[in-house]
Amino acid sequence: MKNAVAYLIFSIFFLFIESEAYSQCCSAGNPVSGDGQQKSINKNQLRIYWSFKHSYSDQYFFKNKKEDIPFIDNSRFNYSSLQATYGVSKKWNIQTELGYFFDKSQTVEIPEKYVFKGFGIGDLGITTKYQILSLIKPQSELVGSFGVKIPVGKFDQDMDGAMLPISLQPSTGAMKYNIGLYYSRVNLNNKWSFYSFLFAEYSSLIQSDFFYYKYGNYYSLALFGKYKLTNRIYTVLQLRQEFRDKDKRENDEKIESTGSKVTYMAPQILYNFYESWYLLAQADVPLYKYVNGHQLTNKYSFSFGVHKTLNLHKKSSE
């Protein structure tokens, strides 16, 4: 009975705030992963990358100002993914990625504290990358990419018989298509490296028994500086600008409290602990946030991972 009352109040609350305070802090689908350095690999090489990410949000914003809303305490997720990249040829790479949400939850006060939780497999990402340009002097590379995200995970997840909101579903429920452009340059002294990328993603319309929804387009621009401290330790500083268009529902109606502009600073450290094995850790800190309407925004996130590049050609020839 207690759970039933809680969900009734929660459902009414969500209907009330949908046009005023829609949460985009942990929207459905996979977080952007990877170490941010999208250099291509050679033919018959295989790069495996495992990562874990934690994100926490407890700050409501109206436009670019923080405000207090007493109902939602926080939203968070814990997500792990496995990514594999294979060198099909000297210029072509193909990449796949699949992840799992161990915890995608929201804590609310209605008036007692309740935690609503989603979990499960996210979206399957498949990306092809092409090396457009490669120079020896200066040592630099330009790579283009095209990818799709397929909603293989659960999108109609409920909790004790009550359907979870779209922001807590482990999958997006929509096909997504993305393009990217990545540039890297290494200085002659091999101490400094510079990277940049442009990324854009388009989402198809969701039409299910429970949701009629379309996520807004997503755009990202990032600049990286990488410095070699020792033979095994590297530091990276990333500045990233993210743009999200407004989401839409029936009759192509835009949802006012969706869409944002956020600037992040992301320090990172990489440790080459054995041959081509690397450990990495990264924090994402919002420097500036501007949202449409009232939105629950990200306070911080951090991630860590390990990646290894294998030379399959050598192994097969032995």
What is each model feature region?
Residues W50, L82-Y86, I126-Y130, F146-V148, ...:
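Residues on the lipid-exposed face of transmembrane beta-strands in outer-membrane beta-barrel proteins
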Residues L46-W50, I94-T96, I126, S140-F146, ...:
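Transmembrane beta-strands of outer-membrane beta-barrel proteins
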Residues S19-Y60, K137, V143, N311-E318:
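Outer-membrane beta-barrel biogenesis signature
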Residues F52-D58, L98-K104, I132, V148-K154, ...:
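Transmembrane beta-strands of outer-membrane beta-barrel pores
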Residues N42, V88-W92, I132-P138, R185-N189, ...:
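Outer-membrane beta-barrel strand-turn architecture
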Residues N44, R76-S80, G118-L124, S140, ...:
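Residues that define the transmembrane beta-barrel architecture of outer-membrane proteins
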Residues D103-F199, S203-F211:
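Outer-membrane pore/translocation modules
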Residues Q59-K63, E67-P70, Y212-E318:
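Outer membrane beta-barrel transmembrane domains
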